[in-house]
A protein has these predicted regions:
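Conserved donor-binding/catalytic core segment of Leloir-type glycosyltransferases
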Residues: 4, 194-211, 217-221
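Donor nucleotide-sugar binding/catalytic pocket of nucleotide-sugar-dependent glycosyltransferases
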Residues: 135-184
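Short acidic/histidine- and often glycine-rich active-site loop of Leloir-type glycosyltransferases
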Residues: 121, 169, 239-240, 293-308
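Short hydrophobic beta-strand element within catalytic cores of glycosyltransferases
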Residues: 288-292
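Conserved acidic donor-binding segment of nucleotide-sugar-dependent glycosyltransferases
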Residues: 249, 302-303, 307-314, 321-328
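Aromatic "clamp/platform" in nucleotide-sugar-dependent glycosyltransferases that forms part
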Residues: 271
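A short, well-ordered alpha-helix in the C-terminal region of glycosyltransferases
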Residues: 330-352
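N-terminal subdomain of nucleotide-sugar transferases
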Residues: 1-45, 50, 54, 221, ...
Length: 374
C-alpha cells in the first residue's frame, strides 16, 4: 500500500500537525512495509527526507514558515505520478482541493484529517460572518472526502454541528519510549537559577492567541515567586512576569522530553485544543497536567492524572495549580504514565490508522462511508 499525506502545514515549528506527520512517517518506515510519501508546500521544489516531496508555495504573511500551495496542475500531476493507493489531506488549504482532484482522477479514496478548529478561530478573530463562511468552506471540502478523521470526540461533535458527516475518531498517540520518566534531570532548577523548593511548571507550544498565553501568564503572576513557569516555544508573548522564563522552540525530541520530565507538571490554558498531543507527551514523561476544561482536554486528562480549570480565568487556573500541589504529584504522574500506556501509545494510534487506510483501499468506493462505523 502507498499512502500519501498532503499538507501546507510543514516545518518543525508549525505545531502538532507537522509533528504528527513526521512521527507517522518514521513509524511507517520502521514498523511496516507501507510506502509513505508526503507532498508539502515549500519555498522551492525538491525532495526532502524519507519520501517527502516539495512543491513551491507562496509565503503567507504573518504565518511563519507556512506557504500557500499554487499551480494546481503541477500538484495534481505530481500526485498522479506518485500513484498512491490512498490520500490523507491534513488541512483544508488549496493542496487539499488539488488532492481531491487527483483522487478522483486516480479513483482512490481521500481521507480528510480535521486537525484544526478553524471555525472557532474565525469567530474569535473576525466575527460571526467569518464563522459562517468558514463553516460553509469546511463543509464543502470535507463532505467531498470519503472519510473524515477527527482526533477527538470533541472535534467529531464540532464537525457534526457544521453538517459534516462520515466522521470517524482516531486519537493521536505519543512515542512512550522517547517521552519517558527516565528522561528526568535533577539539575533543571539549578540551570534556571531557582531554589530546589521552587514549584516548577512547564508550557510547551506556540505562543498564539488560541493557546491563551495571557491567561497563563496572569495566573503565574497571581501565584507569585514560589511558582516558576518555563515557557518553551515560538511566537510573540506579552511582557513576562518575573517568575516566567522563556526558552526558544526545541526541535530535538530528547531535549524536549528531558525538559518536560524535569518539571513538576505541564500547564496549558488553551481551551480549543482539538486533541492536545503535548498533554500526552507530559503524561508519558510521568508528569501530571493542569489544563483548561475546554476542547478535548477532558478526553485525555482525568482526575487521576491532573486537574482541569475553568477556561479563560487566570484565577481559576491558579487555583487548579494550587490544587495540584495539594495532592501527591508523583502518584498523579505515575497514573498519567499508566493512562498513556493503556490508551494513547503511538503504536496503538498508528495501528488503528493503518487499519483505516487498509480498509479504505480494500473497500469498493461506494462502501467506504461504512468505515465510519469502525
Amino acid at each position: 500500500m502507498h499512502l500519501l499525506d498532503v499538507t501546507m502545514l510543514h516545518g518543525p515549528a508549525v505545531g502538532g500537525v507537522s509533528r504528527y506527520l513526521s512521527t507517522k512517517r518514521r513509524w511507517m518506515r520502521d514498523n511496516t512495509r507501507v510506502q509513505h510519501s508526503q507532498l508539502v508546500a515549500a519555498a522551492r521544489a525538491g525532495r526532502g527526507e524519507d519520501g517527502e516531496y516539495l512543491l513551491p508555495g507562496l509565503r503567507i504573511p504573518l504565518c511563519g514558515p507556512l506557504r500557500w500551495p499554487i499551480d494546481p496542475m503541477r500538484w495534481v500531476d505530481t500526485i498522479r505520478r506518485l500513484r498512491p493507493d490512498v490520500i490523507e489531506a491534513n488541512d483544508v488549504g488549496s493542496a487539499a482541493w488539488f488532492a481531491l482532484a487527483a483522487a478522483h482522477k486516480l479513483d482512490i479514496p481521500l481521507l480528510g484529517f480535521a486537525h484544526v478548529d478553524l471555525v472557532r478561530f474565525a469567530r474569535e478573530r473576525k466575527g460571526m460572518l467569518a464563522e459562517r463562511v468558514v463553516i460553509g468552506y469546511m463543509r464543502a471540502f470535507y463532505n467531498r472526502c470519503d472519510v473524515v478523521i477527527a482526533p477527538s470526540q470533541y472535534m467529531r461533535t464540532r464537525l457534526a454541528g457544521w453538517g459534516i458527516d462520515r466522521v470517524v475518531v482516531r486519537h493521536l498517540g505519543v512515542d512512550a519510549t522517547q517521552f519517558h520518566p527516565r528522561s528526568r534531570s535533577t539539575n533543571l532548577r539549578a540551570r534556571l537559577g531557582l531554589a530546589e523548593s521552587t514549584r516548577l511548571l512547564i508550557y510547551v507550544g506556540r505562543f498564539s492567541a488560541e493557546k491563551r498565553i495571557g491567561v497563563l501568564l496572569d495566573s503565574l503572576q497571581a501565584l507569585g515567586p514560589r511558582h516558576h513557569l518555563l515557557l518553551v516555544g515560538a511566537g510573540d508573548t506579552p511582557p513576562l512576569p518575573s517568575n516566567v522564563t522563556r526558552m526558544p522552540f526545541v526541535a530535538n525530541t530528547g531535549v524536549l522530553a528531558r525538559l518536560i520530565a524535569s518539571a513538576d507538571a505541564l500547564v496549558h490554558a488553551g481551551d480549543v485544543e482539538t486533541f492536545g498531543l503535548v498533554y500526552l507527551e507530559a503524561m508519558a514523561c510521568g508528569r501530571p497536567v493542569v489544563a483548561a476544561a475546554g476542547g478535548a482536554a477532558s478526553e485525555i486528562v482525568d482526575a487521576n492524572c491532573g486537574v482541569l480549570a475553568r477556561p479563560g480565568s487566570p484565577a481559576a487556573l491558579a487555583e487548579a495549580i494550587e490544587a495540584l500541589y495539594a495532592r501527591d504529584i508523583d502518584a498523579l504522574g505515575a497514573n498519567a504514565r499508566a493512562r498513556v500506556e493503556a490508551h494513547f501509545t503511538l503504536d496503538l494510534s498508528m495501528h488503528r490508522l493503518l487499519a483505516l487506510y487498509r480498509t479504505a483501499v480494500a473497500a469498493p468506493q461506494a462502501s467506504v462511508p461504512a468505515l465510519v462505523a469502525t
